[in-house]
Amino acid sequence: MMELGHCDTTKSFTGKGDFGETSIITGERMAKSAVRIEAIGSVDELNAFIGLCRSENAHKDLDDIFEKVQHKLFVVGAELAHKSEKREKKIEVKNEDISELEKHLNTHNENLDLLKNFILPHGNKLSAYLHASRTICRRAERRIVALSKMEKLNPELIRYLNRLSSLLFVLARTANNRDGIAEKKWKN
């Protein structure tokens, strides 16, 4: 289990962020607009949206995936909050985590029609929330790529988010498919 270090989680506010700065796990202060903070914030937003997906989900197999992903997103956030030279290597995204996402992708793709067109994000609430989560995941991935141009990061972070966004797309299609909702093709 990851330790929060200096963080006092008993207080709901400190007032230290009132002037546009925040602290990361190491205690280092930085601008809230810093690339690292943007990346951490996008991952946090994604985790919250996956929680929203869980609130609309009635399928145990999907909930198991969502919960594992939520736990892993905390790992992603922990990696981003530590500069790579200061990070414990036992708390990191690994190739096995990506393989697990790929396994779920393959399993859920088997029950879906082959796509030949773009489809509109729509359908039941779960599907709509999953599509929104997918776009947040893509943003988080872009923020992590930007940070990786500034410093060395675990390359599995980018791979994990890339695969996760694909899985969220497939699960959005799965949610509609299970409810018998037809996909709407994009028309130009």
What do the predicted segments below correspond to?
Residues 1-188:
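Phosphate/pyrophosphate-binding loop motifs in nucleotide- or prenyl diphosphate-using proteins
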